């Protein structure tokens, strides 16, 4: 492991190795900038993941109550349960669902679109869809987002098929399995989704994009 002088201002220090920190640190390093990524949690490899909800929750979650504020909780039956934040290399890219949607046109300019709504502080973004389009495209290629860059969509499970039948009957013009950062076919050395259903516990096939093994592999 490389060592750096604490007074060396040429070294970039990135806090966290999730979607933001892991991606930024990887890009900086690949462009020749000496970079250190600091991560509070340990490193788990794909073979460490298990199809066990509670087992993996205990292994990868950050259970420190200081990570949340206030007394609101998602579930009343586990009132002391903090927000689900992963404390490990890869951060929440280990347990995210993989949904990768672009902002719709009106979402960039919500103040203009919806007007001045009493009690709400809506603001327009200083950027728009056209400006972000090439960056979206670059991210979608790196993440392997389905239905972009010629990548086919994921197959629908039985639940989806029932929902789609209803959507078709109601006249919906578009209903599909979404744009997901999960390989629908082998790509860049990683396999395709096996429909195991344990995306939140870490992808055992590596089909789902995570900074853990895509951007900061050993």
Question: For each predicted feature, which ranges?
Answer:
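Conserved redox-cofactor binding core of oxidoreductases
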Residues: 75-76, 104-107, 112-218
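N-terminal glycine-rich phosphate/pyrophosphate-binding loop and immediately adjacent elements
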Residues: 2-116, 121-130
């Amino acid at each position: 492991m490389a060592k750096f002088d604490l007074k060396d201002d040429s070294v970039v220090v990135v806090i966290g190795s999730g979607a933001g920190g892991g991606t930024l640190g990887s890009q900086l390093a690949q462009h020749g900038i000496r970079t250190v990524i600091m991560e509070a949690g340990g490193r788990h490899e794909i073979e460490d993941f298990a199809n066990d909800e509670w087992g993996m929750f205990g292994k990868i979650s950050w259970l420190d109550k200081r990570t949340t504020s206030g007394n609101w909780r998602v579930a009343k039956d586990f009132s002391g349960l903090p927000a689900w934040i992963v404390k490990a290399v890869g951060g929440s890219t280990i347990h995210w669902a993989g949904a990768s949607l672009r902002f719709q046109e009106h979402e960039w300019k919500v103040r203009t679109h919806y007007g001045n709504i009493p009690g709400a502080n809506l603001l327009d973004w200083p950027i728009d869809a056209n400006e972000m389009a090439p960056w979206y495209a670059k991210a979608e290629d790196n993440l392997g987002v389905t239905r972009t860059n010629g990548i086919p969509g994921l197959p629908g499970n039985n639940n989806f098929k029932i929902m789609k039948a209803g959507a078709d009957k109601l006249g919906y013009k578009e209903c599909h399995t979404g744009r997901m950062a999960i390989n629908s076919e082998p790509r860049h050395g990683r396999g395709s989704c096996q429909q195991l259903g344990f995306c939140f516990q870490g992808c055992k096939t590596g089909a789902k994009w995570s900074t853990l093994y895509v951007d900061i592999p050993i």
